[in-house]
Amino acid sequence: GLPSCLLCLCLGTSVYCDDAGLEHIPALPPDTTYLYARFNRIGAVRAGDFSGLEKLKHIDLSGNSISRADADAFRLLPSLQELLLPQNLLRELPELPRAIVRLDASLNRIASAGLRPGAFRDLKQLQFLHLSDNQLDFIPVPLPESLRSLHLQNNNIRTMHEDTFCDSQEQGQIRRALEDIRLDGNPINLSLFPNAFFCLPRLPTGRFS
């Protein structure tokens, strides 16, 4: 296809492709650090779409029609810190690179079966995990200690474990970072799990009756 700088606006190492009628990820200059390709008609992200883009730090694909992302579409990007995929049609989450700090895949169709077991365990930099307005049945565990913000509102979460957030064997545990948990808009009654929040700086937002 056409080099992205003809279809999009290239400013320094940022590429702006918002609302450009794109159906595929465009070919990007090798030194690209930021990609904004919001509100297009992109339907899939393939394994080779970002190959060789070792400086790419930020990808925003909000408001496309992405129903499929290959397992390796993002995993091999060594510098990727922010991946924004809200308002798409994803049913499962692709593997994530180790450097990821912020993931937003809200307003998709992701069910718990679409998350690999332990999908977030090894993401030691992850601070913001936003999966609101999906079809999740469970809170994904384990969650890395780095996590600051967990948005799971408007899913189908009905239950949780005493150990979901806190280690019940370690009563002195404090998770200082994790101070923003949203579980509102789920069927779960949080008052049924009185011992599940002792390590948190503040209670989750959600139903307590």
Locate the predicted segments by residue.
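Membrane-proximal C-terminal cap and juxtamembrane stalk of leucine-rich repeat ectodomains
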Residues: G1-S14, D167, G172-S209
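LRR N-terminal entry segment and analogous cap-like coil->beta motifs
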Residues: L9-D49, L53-H58, S62
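Conserved LRR concave beta-strand detector
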Residues: S14, Y34, A44, K55-H58, ...
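Leucine-rich repeat
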Residues: D18, E23, G43, S67, ...
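Consensus "Asn ladder" position of solenoid repeat domains
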Residues: A20, N40, L61-N64, L85-N88, ...
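A structural signal for leucine-rich repeat
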Residues: P26-P29, G48-L53, A71-L77, L93-I100, ...
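N-terminal interaction/assembly modules
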Residues: I110-A111, L115, L123, F128, ...
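Glycine/serine-rich loop-strand microenvironments at binding/catalytic pocket rims
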Residues: Q127-L152
